[in-house]
């Protein structure tokens, strides 16, 4: 039992992004601004190759043929835990590229959201460095879904940074099919 380690990966919430933005906004000086970068990792679970001895546990039989995975599958028992460790490591290494006074990074599974502070030029440079760092780590990036600016959508929320406030709303498509009957929520 001494070799066993119990852990729990704590995923970020919308408030963590808001808190990061507010902290950065407090530090803005003349010419500084705060922006958000949301850029998903593509096919993230398939980043982790299986040890050859483990491949025999990742086999499916379909239509008379056997299929063996060479990479961790998203729906596998330990896939989320293994991927969570890789995602958390990537987040820590990425955050270490800049001081907390310039970058506040949250990663929800395979969806990073970075709050950035600096001049527009500095923010562009920080974005380039983050993107190149992630690519150097082997991450595929969903550029077609990428967003940079004062308004982004991330994991079901819309964030808007204004001069006076940080506005968060639940995306409309998330709320479809949910209504309030006065006593509670119904689906």
What would you call each of these model-derived segments?
Residues 1, 38-42, 75, 98-119, ...:
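Catalytic palm active-site di-aspartate
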Residues 1-84, 133, 176-187:
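Catalytic-core region of right-hand nucleic acid polymerases
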Residues 34, 45-46, 114-115, 141-165:
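Short, conserved secondary-structure transition motifs
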Residues 68, 148-187:
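C-terminal reverse transcriptase regions that engage the nucleic-acid substrate
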Residues 80-134, 143:
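Active-site palm subdomain of RNA-directed nucleic acid polymerases
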Residues 119-138, 163-175:
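Helical (often loop-to-helix) elements that flank the catalytic cores of nucleotide-handling enzymes
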């Amino acid at each position: 039992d001494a070799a066993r380690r119990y852990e729990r990966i704590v995923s970020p919430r919308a408030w963590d992004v808001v808190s990061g933005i507010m902290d950065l906004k407090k530090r803005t000086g003349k010419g500084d601004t705060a922006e958000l970068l949301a850029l998903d990792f593509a096919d993230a679970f398939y980043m982790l190759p299986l040890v050859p001895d483990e491949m025999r546990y990742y086999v499916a039989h379909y239509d008379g043929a056997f299929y063996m995975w060479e990479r961790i599958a998203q729906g596998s028992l330990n896939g989320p835990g293994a991927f969570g460790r890789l995602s958390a490591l990537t987040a820590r290494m990425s955050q270490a590229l800049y001081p907390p006074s310039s970058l506040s990074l949250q990663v929800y599974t395979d969806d990073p959201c970075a709050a950035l502070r600096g001049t527009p030029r500095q923010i562009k440079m920080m974005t380039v460095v983050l993107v190149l760092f992630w690519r150097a780590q082997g991450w595929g990036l969903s550029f077609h879904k990428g967003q940079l600016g004062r308004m982004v959508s991330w994991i079901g929320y819309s964030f808007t940074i204004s001069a006076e406030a940080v506005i968060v709303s639940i995306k409309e498509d998330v709320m479809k099919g949910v209504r309030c009957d006065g006593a509670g929520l119904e689906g």
